[in-house]
Amino acid sequence: MTTAPRAEKLTLFLAEDEEGTAILLKFLLERGGYTVVHAADGQQAQTMIDQMPPPALVLLDIMLPYLNGLQLLAHIRQKAEWQHVPIIMLTADSNERDIEQALAAGANDYMVKPFNPRELTARLQRFIKVAS
């Protein structure tokens, strides 16, 4: 994952409970020059979201313990200061109903796991450019 040099690192928020996926994503994103804040479950993610400034982008797993990704998405979209933050939903299965619900609730995009690192990079760069 390569990105253009920046004066400061952009922060991305990752909510992912599957340890292997979280480690891989953090590695790819940090190697790409981003700072990654990670939550391992929905409850932890909600607490962190309530305490941190808005990141450049959110990667949000749909199937999280305690609060699922759709519940977190609704929580994020209710926060005025997070309204502009792009959100990419991550899903292990391409359940059309979940994807439609996520997009209708305010997600900007979704990716089905496993995903191609180059595709992830392209989507991140597209949304971060649009948001800035």
Enumerate the language-model features and the residues they cover.
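Short, glycine/charged-rich "phosphate-handling" switch motifs in NTP-dependent
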Residues: 108
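Charged docking surfaces used in two-component/phosphorelay signaling
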Residues: 23-31
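Active-site residues of response regulator receiver
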Residues: 61, 91
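C-terminal output helix
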Residues: 115-125
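The feature encodes the CheY-like receiver
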Residues: 65, 83, 95, 113-114
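Conserved acidic carboxylate
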Residues: 16
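Acidic, metal-coordinating helix/loop segments flanking the phosphotransfer/catalytic sites
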Residues: 38-57
